A protein has these predicted regions:
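Short, acidic, metal-binding catalytic loop of nucleotide-sugar glycosyltransferases
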Residues: 23-32
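A conserved acidic beta->alpha catalytic loop
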Residues: 24, 38-47, 63, 93
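Glycine-rich, basic loop-to-helix element that forms the pyrophosphate-binding segment
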Residues: 61-81
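Short beta-strand-to-loop acidic/aromatic patch adjacent to the donor-nucleotide binding site
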Residues: 83-94
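Conserved donor NDP-sugar-binding/catalytic core segment of glycosyltransferases
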Residues: 96-127
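Short, flexible, basic/aromatic active-site loop/helix in glycosyltransferases
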Residues: 130-149
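A short, conserved alpha-helix in the catalytic core of glycosyltransferases
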Residues: 150-158, 162-167, 172-200
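Non-catalytic, C-terminal membrane-associated alpha-helical segments of glycosyltransferases
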Residues: 215-222, 230-286
Length: 286
């Protein structure tokens, strides 16, 4: 019998975490079905999921479709199969036993998306979570659900009705920026995102090396996020864009933002069109 909750996990070479990730869903106090969408893993992820979690719905992509496109496959499945809630769970993350139940109980009051308190594997608040949400948690220290302007998509509980309104992830983003853009569109449609204090979950991403060039490329994605925000002035963002990237280049002593500007110049028509498409209800999934 199908439950009300579908947990979607997008995988790519996920063997390091899969037992804890999927096992935590199996141990949840709220029954949740699992869907794994694999982006061409080469470490045995597919075989492990089929063997250890035979009840999970498994989808094998023909190529690495990226985080957003792979999640859209799961979102469409959830909508067509009558689920009430979707939980987007990173492959390097896991939930506490009562996490999903606490979040479902906290929905309401205009929230279209909720996150638990996100910790690292050592039990400390995840650094990015604290940086993005910490001051709002401190400001509303008596509130069980704290409104925040943004929270990372490692752990999202989303009612399927939210996807009918906001849509899925934009195809413009293949790696990073998808969650920023989705929340911009969530706000555009008058919905809120929040953090549930009584729900806890882990995002295990400490101690992963990353080159300066890669870090700078990821910083540059923030420019695409701003251009894609349906609530912002597109022309104004285009005018600011060169100065923003130049400042980023000077501050970080890197040529990556300048090279990124050349790439981005050819993308402007596509970004403008996709931004308009993103305003429609159910964008990118219907």
């Amino acid at each position: 019998m199908m439950g009300e909750v579908l947990v979607i996990v997008v995988t790519w070479n996920a063997m390091t975490w899969l037992e804890r990730c999927l096992g935590s869903v199996r141990g949840s106090s709220v029954k949740a079905d699992i869907m794994v969408v694999d982006n061409c893993s080469t470490d045995g992820t597919q075989e492990y999921v089929r063997r250890a979690f035979p009840d999970a719905v498994f989808v094998q992509n023909d190529s690495n479709a990226g985080f957003g496109a792979a999640n859209n496959i799961g979102i469409k499945y959830a909508l067509s199969h009558g689920y009430r809630y979707v939980y987007l769970l990173n492959q390097d993350a896991w939930v506490d036993k009562d996490c999903i139940g606490s979040m479902i109980a906290s929905l309401g009051d205009g929230y279209g998306l909720l996150s638990p308190m996100q910790t690292d594997a050592r039990g400390n608040l995840d650094r990015n979570f604290e940086r993005k949400c910490g001051k709002f948690l401190a400001r509303h220290n008596d509130s069980p659900v704290v409104p925040v302007p943004f929270v990372m998509a490692a752990h999202w509980l989303v009612p399927t009705q939210t996807f009918r309104i906001v849509g899925g992830f934009s195809p413009v983003f293949t790696q990073y920026g998808e969650d920023d853009n989705f929340i911009d569109r969530l706000h555009y449609h008058g919905l809120k995102c929040g953090v549930v204090r009584t729900a806890t979950a882990v995002h295990d991403r400490l101690d992963r090396p990353s080159s300066k060039e890669r870090r700078m490329r990821l910083k540059c994605v923030s420019v695409i996020v701003k251009l894609s925000n349906p609530s912002a002035c597109f022309t104004g963002q285009c005018l600011i864009l060169p100065f923003r990237l130049l400042g980023m280049s000077v501050k970080n002593r890197s040529l990556v933002p300048l090279r990124f500007f050349r790439e981005l110049s050819g993308m402007i028509p596509v970004l403008k069109r996709t931004r308009e498409e993103s305003k429609a209800s159910g964008a990118f999934i219907f």
